[in-house]
Amino acid sequence: MQSLQHKASEWSGVPSDEAFAIDDTNRFLKLGLQTFINLSTNFYNRVYDDDEEWFRSIFADSEKQNAIQNQYEFFVQRMGGPPLFSQRRGHPALIGRHRPFPVTHEAAERWLHHMQQALDSTPDIDDDSKIKMQNFFRHTAYFLVAGNELKKQNEQMPCKHAAGSDNS
């Protein structure tokens, strides 16, 4: 079985080393807290105004301000800043936190579309950071898709310890 990282690289077209080049520079120190807040605000304004009802419905049970805060706190923490997300919400556990949502190839592409627009409309993000962030986001989106597909496969497999199974 291929690892989730391998699947993410295959499906996203972004090799792991390019995805994790995000760590070459402390993006939090380079960009600052307000830039991450602006990026997440730009992103979720687009998501909540999306023309596609199926995509908006993924976020229907989340308050926009909470979604913005969760995202920018995760980005800050992941990109070299203080552990804001973990202090408030615990371990990021991306696959587990996204488990209730339909994380499909189509949803990943729609998410990435909005993130690209948000990156392009956040002027304080330099070109090098933008490219590295795009690669990280693309790889991570498909990491979540791979995790979702693995979850579906596991749900379809009967448990060998299921009630009524013959263990003799």
From Swiss-Prot:
Give the induction annotation.
Repressed by cytokinins (CK, an equimolar mixture of kinetin and 6-benzyl-aminopurine) in roots.
Tissue-specific expression: Equally expressed in all organs, including root nodules, leaves, roots, stems, flowers and fruits.
SUPFAM superfamilies attached to this UniProt entry? Globin-like
GO terms for molecular function, please? heme binding; metal ion binding; oxygen binding; oxygen carrier activity
Q: Name one Pfam family in it.
A: Bac_globin
Query: Which keywords appear in this protein's UniProt record, sorted alphabetically?
Result: Heme, Iron, Metal-binding, Nodulation, Oxygen transport, Transport
What Gene3D superfamilies does its record include? Globins
Chaperone keyword on record = no
Q: Which CDD domains match?
A: TrHb2_AtGlb3-like_O
Q: Which residues of the sequence carry a binding annotation for heme b? A: H98
Q: Give a GO biological-process term.
A: nodulation
Null allele outcome, as annotated, is: Reduced shoots, roots and leaves size and fewer leaves, but increased number of flowers and small pods containing less seeds. Delayed nodules formation of smaller size.
Q: Looking at the record's lineage, which domain of life comes first?
A: Eukaryota
Quaternary form?
Homodimer when ferric.
Tell me its family: Belongs to the truncated hemoglobin family. Group II subfamily.
Q: What does this protein do?
A: Hemoglobin-like protein that exhibits an unusual concentration-independent binding of O(2) and CO. Required for general plant development and during nodulation. May promote shoot organogenesis from root explants.
Q: What is this protein called?
A: Group 2 truncated hemoglobin 3-2
